[in-house]
Amino acid sequence: MRVLLLTPLFQPEPNHLKGLAFARELVRRGHDVEVLTGFPHYPAGKVYPGYRIRPWMREILDGVPVTRVMMYPSHDRSAVRRTAGYLSLAGTAALLGPPLVARPDVVHVYQGPATLAWPAMVFRMMFGTPYVLDVQDMWPESVTVTGMLSLPGVSAVLGAWSKATYRLARKIIVLSNGYKKCLEARGVPEKKIEVVYNWCDERSLPGETDGEGSDPFGLAGRFNVVYSGNFGALQALGGVLDAAFLIEEKRPDIRFVFVGDGVEESALKKKADGRGQKNVLFIPRQAPESLGRITARADVLLVHLKDDPLARMGIPQKTQASLAAGKPVLLAIRGSAAELAARAGGAWTCRPEDPAALAEAVLGLASLSWNERETMGRRNAEFYRKELAFSIGVGRMTAVFEEAAVRPRRKEGGR
């Protein structure tokens, strides 16, 4: 089977689960794989050294052919620039993709931006190629809830566009049962939708000796509550700082460790510095291997999201990473993520955006014995290996691709 991976990000850009490792695994399983994407610019919005914007270029990464097309690089708060980035990649991929890449049996659309279905629609129209829509963000909510695009009428236009992409897709992959229910409520036939949970970057998992040896960030000897990921509006990390402030005098040995970066980073640091908080540590974004060493010294891994309908439907990727790490997990989130973690047996939940509830939960976890927390972590790791691991997820993805590619071509969509 010849698979085209249509994606807004790809290596060397970080944190893309269905990137190069995914492509290599598909090749290992006997499939021909090609990638159609833009030029690497995430997360800073600047094109990486060694690349320059041009109409198109080809390269081979670990044996996988990658075709990159011209786009406007942006990943900041500007709605105009972000929109230009989304539309430019979709437009040039729609124009240049068909003549540049080998004709696929199926197109996998990593959505991301809903606009990226545009080139897949072109392949469908020109060659009858079916596409599988992998819904990672629910549009239009993902851009309207955050305030990225809040102009009158934008939500209606994006909603209509999204419905068209769902109708024309041969199959739709979603990351949670919450997303599945949402699409069904919007008229997508249940038989078209498959739930495939995301896996995590397993290179970032702590090794057996990662908690030993050098400790460059001074984590030893403290009870570390570690948050790793994006510092954005949806993560609502200001509330985590408030929780840390509430317990600093009660338990000065407890420290909140933030690993990563994002648009809220400066504001968070300013808030912590303004209150003189000593129980907060910010660590820059780390390579997967380095992150594993930090995770090994964590006592609790934190998942925190703003409390809104979009957050309740989805499952942030750090949920899987936290479970796989074999540590107790604290989720300040409701909905699909909390339901998934509850099945693992080693996670606590509390109300999101409630610093007092978060502080109480952290104090409760800190009061448990080491053996109790170790048991929680072991249950989480076992659940990840059996239900969420990379090999399991790729197998489920491949089955969806094969079903999409062999189904008789007929009018798609509708009931």
Regions found by a protein language model. Name each.
Residues 178, 199:
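Carbohydrate-associated surface elements
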Residues 235, 287-294, 299-323, 330-339:
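Nucleotide-sugar-dependent
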